[in-house]
């Protein structure tokens, strides 16, 4: 036992211990049985020898009895001779003393023989009693061996049942692992879809912010155009007044008027080119919007295009400023012409015609402004569609969250199953502990039996010392021992096979315990991932609410700016055309408020 334990690399299971104990018990019991049989044969032979000695002693006793009778006869004869032969008394007395000494020696021999006979009888009785005890012990050991074999069979059946239960648990574990893999894949796909949707939402928000910035810039450009138109009208009024004064100077300034007409024609061409560029920019903006609706991947291109358009708009503003500067230069020239040409009043008709032409240009510019406003409205409609798409994406996010909740419910069910498996495992462990205790009790009983057997062995060794003459019989019994060893080797091979099966079962149990530990680690990792995703969702919601509040503030500031900008021209002039141009700003404010309502929703 100690060698097998020292050689084993790891601690054997209680079932392996029980099997080893059973094997050793079988070996020891078979050896003890054979030794007891040999001892019985020795005792029988010893008894035969003792009986032979008793027979010899009885024959000697009979001889002594005969000699004693003969001595008595001789004594009687001598007495008769003493009576008859008084003379020969001295001779006979010496003979009588000698015979008395012989009688005493014979009596001592007789007493010694009687004592030896009593001792041998007592020793035989003791040996018979010891033989009966040994036979009873052998019977008890046989019964114990039978009980141990039955217990081994029952334990093997229980081990097979436990193996079946472990296989069922392994199958359930595989099913649960498959379910967990599916759930983890679903969670990963949901996380990826959430990330993609959040990216698309962020892209849409960026596009909306860029569109709003573009609309703001266009409104600012329209305001600047209106201011320029008002300035041009003022300049036209001033030119009409000046032309009334310069009616007398027509003849002298005819050539100057021709030059001015050429410059006006150039300005018209420049304005037409600017209007064409504006129409081209509007068409490009519409194309860009269609591209934005089609693909979200071309956002960077759109940004570059918007930057180029902003640069073109800035160039247009610079050109308008240059035109204003040219107009101022023309006014200076006109003043110089007023000082030089007071006699050109006759050419007022041509100047009025030119003023009418300028009014027509102003009307065309107002039409272009209306077109810009219509384009802004289309921008706003597209922004509303983008908001609707954002709302749809948020609904999809809610659906994904519901799917997450269902996945969490599935995870809770899997946890409950894991708890049930742990409880069943604990029950199995308790059963194994109870069996280990039973095996320990059996081992204690076996130890007590071994101690008794060792005592018997010590007694047998003490008796072997007295019976060394019976070693010749052991040679005949060696063949029987060889056959018994062969049978024991076969039994040991069977026991080794059983040990290997038990080792395989223990390895399976260890693998299953490792799998359960890995399963628990996976469950803890999934719980940590879920906590992280929950925290990320909370932070994203907080950032979303913060962005909504910032958008509200920005829209509130932009609305205040638009209101202040629309109030300024109202204080300056009260023409119906300006009131007509004021209505789109109100529509912009309303659309922005509606967009904010959509975002709040």
From Swiss-Prot:
<dbReference type="InterPro" id="IPR051877">
    <property type="entry name" value="Centriole_BasalBody_StrucProt"/>
</dbReference>
<feature type="region of interest" description="Disordered">
    <location>
        <begin position="1"/>
        <end position="20"/>
    </location>
</feature>
<feature type="compositionally biased region" description="Polar residues">
    <location>
        <begin position="563"/>
        <end position="573"/>
    </location>
</feature>
<feature type="compositionally biased region" description="Basic and acidic residues">
    <location>
        <begin position="574"/>
        <end position="588"/>
    </location>
</feature>
<feature type="region of interest" description="Disordered">
    <location>
        <begin position="563"/>
        <end position="588"/>
    </location>
</feature>
<dbReference type="GO" id="GO:0005814">
    <property type="term" value="C:centriole"/>
</dbReference>
<feature type="region of interest" description="Interaction with HIF1A">
    <location>
        <begin position="459"/>
        <end position="592"/>
    </location>
</feature>
<keyword id="KW-0963">Cytoplasm</keyword>
<comment type="function">
    <text>Plays a role in spermatogenesis. When overexpressed, prevents nuclear localization of HIF1A.</text>
</comment>
<comment type="similarity">
    <text>Belongs to the CEP135/TSGA10 family.</text>
</comment>
<comment type="subunit">
    <text>Interacts with HIF1A.</text>
</comment>
<dbReference type="GO" id="GO:0005737">
    <property type="term" value="C:cytoplasm"/>
</dbReference>
<feature type="compositionally biased region" description="Basic residues">
    <location>
        <begin position="1"/>
        <end position="10"/>
    </location>
</feature>
<keyword id="KW-0597">Phosphoprotein</keyword>
<feature type="modified residue" description="Phosphoserine">
    <location>
        <position position="591"/>
    </location>
</feature>
<keyword id="KW-0206">Cytoskeleton</keyword>
<protein>
    <recommendedName>
        <fullName>Testis-specific gene 10 protein</fullName>
    </recommendedName>
</protein>
């Amino acid at each position: 036992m100690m060698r097998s334990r020292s050689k084993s690399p790891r601690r054997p299971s209680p079932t392996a211990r029980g099997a080893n104990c059973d094997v050793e018990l079988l070996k020891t019991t078979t050896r003890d049985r054979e030794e007891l049989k040999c001892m019985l044969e020795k005792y029988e032979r010893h008894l035969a020898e003792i009986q032979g000695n008793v027979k010899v002693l009885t024959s000697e006793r009979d001889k002594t009895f005969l000699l004693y009778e003969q001595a008595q006869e001789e004594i009687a004869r001598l007495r008769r001779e003493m009576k008859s032969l008084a003379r020969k008394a001295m001779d006979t007395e010496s003979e009588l003393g000698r015979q008395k000494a012989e009688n005493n020696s014979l009596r001592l021999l007789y007493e010694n023989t009687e004592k030896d006979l009593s001792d041998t009888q007592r020793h035989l009785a003791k040996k018979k009693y010891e033989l009966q005890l040994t036979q009873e012990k052998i019977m008890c050991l046989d019964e114990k061996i039978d009980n141990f074999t039955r217990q081994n069979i029952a334990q093997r059946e229980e081990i097979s049942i436990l193996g079946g239960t472990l296989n069922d648990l392994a199958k359930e574990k595989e099913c649960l692992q498959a379910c967990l893999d599916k759930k983890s894949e679903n969670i990963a796909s949901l996380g990826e879809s959430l990330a993609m949707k959040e990216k698309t939402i962020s892209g849409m928000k960026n596009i909306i912010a860029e569109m709003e910035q573009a609309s703001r810039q266009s409104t600012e450009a329209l305001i600047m155009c209106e201011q320029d138109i008002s300035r041009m009208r003022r300049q036209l009024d001033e030119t009409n007044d000046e032309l009334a004064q310069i009616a007398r100077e027509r003849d002298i300034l005819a050539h100057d008027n021709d030059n001015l007409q050429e410059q006006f024609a150039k300005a018209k061409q420049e304005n037409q080119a600017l209007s064409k560029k504006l129409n081209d920019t509007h068409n490009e903006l519409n194309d860009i919007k269609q591209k934005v609706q089609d693909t979200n991947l071309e956002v960077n291109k759109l940004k570059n295009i918007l930057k180029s358009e902003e640069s073109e708009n800035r160039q247009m503003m610079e050109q308008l400023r240059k035109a204003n500067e040219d107009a101022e230069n023309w006014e200076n020239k006109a003043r110089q012409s007023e000082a030089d040409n007071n006699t050109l009043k006759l050419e007022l008709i041509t100047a009025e015609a030119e003023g009418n032409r300028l009014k027509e240009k102003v009307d065309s510019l107002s039409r272009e402004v209306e077109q810009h406003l219509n384009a802004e409205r289309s921008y706003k409609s597209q922004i509303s569609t983008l908001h609707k798409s954002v709302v749809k994406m948020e609904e999809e996010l809610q659906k994904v969250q519901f799917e997450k909740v269902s996945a969490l419910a599935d995870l809770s069910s899997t946890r409950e199953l894991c708890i049930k498996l742990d409880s069943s495992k604990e029950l199995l462990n308790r059963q194994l502990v109870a069996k280990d205790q039973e095996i320990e009790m059996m081992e204690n009983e076996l130890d007590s039996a071994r101690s008794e057997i060792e005592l018997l062995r010590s007694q047998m060794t003490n008796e072997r010392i007295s019976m060394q003459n019976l070693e010749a019989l052991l040679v005949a019994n060696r063949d029987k021992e060889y056959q018994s060893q062969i049978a024991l080797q076969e039994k040991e091979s069977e026991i080794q096979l059983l040990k290997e099966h038990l080792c395989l079962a223990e390895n399976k149990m260890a693998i299953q315990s490792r799998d359960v530990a890995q399963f628990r680690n996976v469950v803890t990792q999934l719980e940590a991932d879920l906590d992280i995703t929950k925290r990320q969702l909370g932070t994203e919601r907080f950032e979303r609410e913060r962005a909504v509040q910032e958008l509200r503030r920005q829209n509130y500031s932009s609305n205040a700016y638009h209101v202040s900008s629309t109030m300024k021209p109202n204080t300056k002039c009260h023409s119906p055309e300006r009131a007509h141009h004021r209505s789109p700003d109100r529509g912009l404010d309303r659309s922005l408020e509606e967009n904010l309502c959509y975002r709040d929703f």
